[in-house]
Amino acid sequence: IQWILTVMAKHTGKLVIPAINFGNDSSQFAAIVVNDSSQVNNTNEDLFLQVEVSTTEPYIQQQVIYTLKLFRRVNIAQASLTEPELADALIEKLGEDTNYNTQFQGENYVVTKRKYAIFPQKSGIATIIPLSLTAGVIIPGQRRSNSFFNQQRTRTKQVVSAAIKLDVQAKPENTGVDWLPAK
């Protein structure tokens, strides 16, 4: 029996993964260095996220279209993606995801696009926190030997999008009691 334990760092720095005990067996400890993901350039990556908004200066309660694009040159399994979050806002997913092929910086990618409608409910500076994708990247040509289910080997990868700042404008003074922002 072989046990595989996947760990994800919660912060940067020099970290020690302690020895893991299971019955009479014990692993070795491991010392690692975790770098800030913002220092990693997403270009030429096999897997990355891009996010954009229709406007960075909406009025209060105005619809902002938030578009997420997952670029990948690898096959993934067991993916988990966080949802967009913005304090004092209503957020709703729009439609179904779309998939297409594209070239980005000379490389071919499969892109999955997802859209959300965000309605800020409070004026002022607000930040849409970064989205996080955790996925098993399938290692080509490697299957678990003697596996009853013939599962493919994966390595866990986590990618994070950029944060987006919104400068939400208060409703104009001459609008009266009823307010419905529109384009």
Predicted regions and their residues:
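Surface-exposed interaction/ligand-binding surfaces
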Residues: I1-K183
